[in-house]
UniProtKB/Swiss-Prot annotation:
Family to which this protein belongs: Belongs to the ATPase C chain family.
Pfam families: ATP-synt_C
HAMAP family with a match to the protein in the record: ATP_synth_c_bact
Keyword ATP-binding belongs to the record: no
Free-text function comment from the UniProt entry: F(1)F(0) ATP synthase produces ATP from ADP in the presence of a proton or sodium gradient. F-type ATPases consist of two structural domains, F(1) containing the extramembraneous catalytic core and F(0) containing the membrane proton channel, linked together by a central stalk and a peripheral stalk. During catalysis, ATP synthesis in the catalytic domain of F(1) is coupled via a rotary mechanism of the central stalk subunits to proton translocation.
Gene Ontology CC: plasma membrane; proton-transporting ATP synthase complex; proton-transporting two-sector ATPase complex, proton-transporting domain
Keyword terms of this UniProt record: ATP synthesis, Cell inner membrane, Cell membrane, CF(0), Hydrogen ion transport, Ion transport, Lipid-binding, Membrane, Transmembrane, Transmembrane helix, Transport
GO biological process: proton motive force-driven ATP synthesis
PANTHER family per the UniProt record, alphabetical: ATP SYNTHASE LIPID-BINDING PROTEIN, MITOCHONDRIAL, ATPASE PROTEIN 9
Name of the featured protein: ATP synthase subunit c
Length: 82
């Protein structure tokens, strides 16, 4: 593998994980904040809010996992290898 291609693949893998974690991280923080706010306003709806929160957090976390999978492909099964 060309040295430049190898270096670019490592940088791309790091960026894939880093950038894939920024959006969901901010979204998870906002969702947890609003869920806590909603539970404080309506304690009787706690179960419904918590269930919805956990489902949405799982969907947000899947985006980070996709970034991790892209970085693993770039590091170990690099399609740009000659």
């Amino acid at each position: 593998m060309n040295d430049i291609t190898a270096a670019a693949s490592v940088i791309a893998a790091a960026l894939a994980v880093g950038l894939a974690a920024i959006g969901p991280g901010i979204g998870q923080g906002n969702a947890a904040s609003k869920a806590a706010e909603g539970i404080a306003r309506q304690p009787e709806a706690e179960g419904k809010i918590r269930g919805t929160l956990l489902l949405s957090l799982a969907f947000m976390e899947s985006l980070t996992i996709y970034g991790l999978l892209v970085s693993i492909v770039l590091l170990f099964a690099n399609p740009f290898r000659g």
